[in-house]
From Swiss-Prot:
Protein name: Protein PB1-F2
GO biological process terms held by the UniProt record: symbiont-mediated perturbation of host apoptosis; symbiont-mediated suppression of host cytoplasmic pattern recognition receptor signaling pathway via inhibition of MAVS activity
HAMAP family reported for this sequence: INFV_PB1F2 (MF_04064)
Originating gene: PB1
Spans annotated as Disordered: 1-30
Reported function: Plays an important role in promoting lung pathology in both primary viral infection and secondary bacterial infection. Promotes alteration of mitochondrial morphology, dissipation of mitochondrial membrane potential, and cell death. Alternatively, inhibits the production of interferon in the infected cell at the level of host mitochondrial antiviral signaling MAVS. Its level of expression differs greatly depending on which cell type is infected, in a manner that is independent of the levels of expression of other viral proteins. Monocytic cells are more affected than epithelial cells.
Site (described: Low pathogenicity): 66
Oligomer status and interactors: Oligomer. Interacts with human SLC25A6/ANT3 and VDAC1. Interacts with host MAVS.
Similarity comment: family membership: Belongs to the influenza viruses PB1-F2 family.
Primary localization class, coarse: host cell
Cellular component annotations (GO), alphabetically ordered: host cell cytosol; host cell mitochondrial inner membrane; host cell nucleus; membrane
Further details from the record: Is not encoded in all strains, and seems to be dispensable for replication.
Length: 90
């Protein structure tokens, strides 16, 4: 029987089926995730990536030293903090 390779995808989804051999020993085989599990994993992964990109761009913009943007920067920082708190509660 062909053995599946242990890829980052199969490691991260961790879908394991346990089978019994004729001699009573148990073997573990990585199973294929269904469509719902795949979509759930995809959405969790992309949400984490999007949040990281959004955080990086906000931090980069907030680090600018332009005096004209100081009031905007203050308002944006307050909005970002409230957004972060809101994201943690959801």
């Amino acid at each position: 029987m062909e053995q599946e390779q242990d890829t980052p995808w199969t490691q991260s989804t961790e879908h394991i089926n346990i089978q019994k051999k004729g001699n009573g020993q148990q073997t573990q085989k990585l199973g294929r995730p269904n469509l719902t599990q795949l979509m759930d994993h995809y959405l969790r992964t992309t949400n984490q990536v999007d949040m990281h990109k959004q955080t990086a761009s906000w931090k980069q913009w907030l680090s600018l030293k332009n005096p004209i943007q100081e009031s905007l920067k203050t308002r944006a920082l307050k909005r970002w903090k409230s957004f972060s708190k809101q994201g943690l509660t959801n």
